Amino acid sequence: MYTTRASRHIDAPPSAVYQALVDPADIPRWRVPYGMTCQVHDFDAREGGTFRVSLHYDTADGTGKSGARTDTYHGRFAELLADERVVEVIEFETTDPLLQGAMTLTTTLVAMDGGTAVLVVHEGVPDAVPAADNEAGTRMALERLASLVEGRSAG
């Protein structure tokens, strides 16, 4: 198991970024790498609340962890600190023992330079998930998050 970190500055206040982290309608718009679509099955954004999300590959050559072209994960919100931090404990839905086990995803927001510094720390990632893929997917999601939230702040 390993840990990845990714960060990005977003030109919007922490409150706007936090809202996108906990709004189930926003999740499919940003929390997905390019080449995939996102489906939110359940999403109860409160401490102890649970969620279930699937990422579907757009092309036939995508190999999923939960199915032929799908990565499904579920989890719970371990901590929600408005405008500051979201801590999630997540697990892939898979029969592959090399992909099983709980991971912790911590997103920290800090007001900085008229916007928000966002740090995502993904701990306990199974070694069977290539670190470069995990890092790239997180960076793509942060790029989408920035586009979504900055677009709202500019409007």
Question: Where do the PLM segments sit?
Answer:
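Short beta-strand segments enriched in hydrophobic/aromatic residues
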Residues: 10, 21, 55-57, 92, ...
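Glycine-rich portal/gate segments that line the openings of hydrophobic small-molecule binding cavities
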Residues: 39-91
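Hydrophobic ligand-binding cavity/cleft-lining segments
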Residues: 1-38
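Beta-strand/loop substructures that line and gate deep hydrophobic ligand-binding cavities in soluble
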Residues: 78-79, 87-139
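Hydrophobic pocket/interface hotspot
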Residues: 17-18, 27, 51, 77, ...
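Short, highly charged C-terminal tails/helix-capping segments
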Residues: 148-155
